[in-house]
Amino acid sequence: MAWLQPTLCRKELESRQTSGLDAAMKAAGKKYFGTALTVRNDAGETNVLNTKGEFGSITPENAMKWEAIQPNRGQFNWGPADQHANAATQRGMELRCHTLVWHSQLPSWVANGNWNNQTLQQVMKDHINAVMGRYKGKCTHWDVVNEALNEDGTYRDSVFYRVIGEAFIPIAFRMVLAADPTTKLYYNDYNLEYGGAKTAGAIRITKLIQSYGLRIDGVGLQAHMTSESTPTQSTVTPSRANLASVLNSFTKLNVDVAYTELDIRMNTPANQQKLQANAAAYARMVGSCMDVKRCVGVTVWGISDKYSWVPGTFPGEGSALLWDDNFNKKPSYTSSLNTIRACWKCHRLLVSIS
C-alpha cells in the first residue's frame, strides 16, 4: 500500500468532479458547502441552486424562526418551512434547520407573556415538539439556541433568561434531544470568530450543556465579517491562523464547528481593489475551516448580493456574497473554490491506494 504525498493528493482530489463548492468540500473530506435560502421565483437564483456540486445544504433564512412558524399560540404556519424542506429533499441536499430558541423574530405573545419558570418551559416544549415532530428525520442539524450572549460574554436579556435563567439553554437541548435524537444539535452565535469575551462565553455555554450530561454536537460561528473597516465594524476578518485557533478552542471540548452564516461585507460601491480584498478574506475564512479537522462545513448567508440582508441592515455596506446582483461569480467565489481545492493540510487526509 502506498501513501500519496500532498502534491499527489491535490491532483487526486482535483481529478474528481470538484467543479462546484460543495463537490470540492466533500472531496477534501468535509461534509458540505451550503447556503441560506428564501424560496422565491427568481430564475437566476434557481439556476445557481440547481447547479450540480455547488451547494450541498440549505438553511431556511427565516422560514423556521418562531415568529414565522407559530405567530399565535397554537396556530402554525408550515407553508414556507415546508417549501424549504422540500427544496432540500428534491435536490438531495442536507437541511440545516434554524432556529428554535432565539430572542429575536419572536412573536409578542411569547416575548411579552406573563410567564413563570414552569409555564415558559411548557411553551418552549410545545413549540419544540411541534416543529421537531413536523421535520423529524429531515433536519440534519438544528440551531437549538441562537445568540444568547452579549458582546462581553454575559447572557443577553431575553424572556427566556429573565424567567428561567441560564438553565433555559440546556433545557432547550434536552427537549430537542427528546424530540429527535438523530439530529445534530448546535449553539449558534455571531462575533465568536475573534477569540474575545464572547468566544469565552460560548465556550462556557458548551461546558454548561455538557455539565447537564447532555449532548451538544457543535458550535456554529455565524461569521458575519468585513474585508475592510466599516462604520459598523472596525475589525476586519482575522488571519487564517487566528481563525483556526478559535475553531480549535471549541473542538477541544469534543464538539464540531461550522461557519453557519458566512458573508463578508465592505463599504459600497465595490471596486476591483475592494473585491480582491474581499476575496482574500473569504480565502482566510474558508481556509481556516479546511485547517481544522472538526470544522464540518461552511454555509454562506445567501447566494447573491441581490437578496443579501446586509445593505438593509448596514446602510452603505454590502457586496458580501459570492455572486453579484446579476448572479455572476465574484472573485470571492474563485478564491473560496481555489482554497478548498488547494487541500491545505492534505497530509492529514492521506489517500491510500492499492
Curated annotation (Swiss-Prot):
Gene Ontology BP terms: xylan catabolic process
Any one GO cellular component localisation term in the record: extracellular region
Pfam families: Glyco_hydro_10
Temperature dependence: Optimum temperature is 40 degrees Celsius.
InterPro entries: GH10, GH10_dom, Glycoside_hydrolase_SF
Every GH10 domain range: 19-339
Catalytic residues in the record: E147 (proton donor), E261 (nucleophile)
MF (Gene Ontology): endo-1,4-beta-xylanase activity
Upregulating conditions: Expression is under the control of transcription factor XYR1 and highly induced by xylan.
Main location: secreted
Glycan attachment positions: N117
Catalytic activity: Endohydrolysis of (1->4)-beta-D-xylosidic linkages in xylans
This protein's pathway: Glycan degradation; xylan degradation
EC numbers, comma separated: 3.2.1.8
Root EC class: hydrolase
pH dependence of this protein's activity: Optimum pH is 6.0.
Stored PROSITE patterns: GH10_2
Cysteines joined through disulfide linkages: C289-C295
Subcellular location: Secreted
Keywords (A to Z) from UniProt: Carbohydrate metabolism, Disulfide bond, Glycoprotein, Glycosidase, Hydrolase, Polysaccharide degradation, Secreted, Signal, Virulence, Xylan degradation
Known role: Endo-1,4-beta-xylanase involved in the hydrolysis of xylan, a major structural heterogeneous polysaccharide found in plant biomass representing the second most abundant polysaccharide in the biosphere, after cellulose. Plays an important role in causing fusarium head blight (FHB) on cereal crops.
Family in the record: Belongs to the glycosyl hydrolase 10 (cellulase F) family.
Entry-linked PANTHER family: ENDO-1,4-BETA-XYLANASE (PTHR31490:SF35), GLYCOSYL HYDROLASE (PTHR31490)
Protein's recorded name: Endo-1,4-beta-xylanase 1
Lineage of source species: Eukaryota, Fungi, Dikarya, Ascomycota, Pezizomycotina
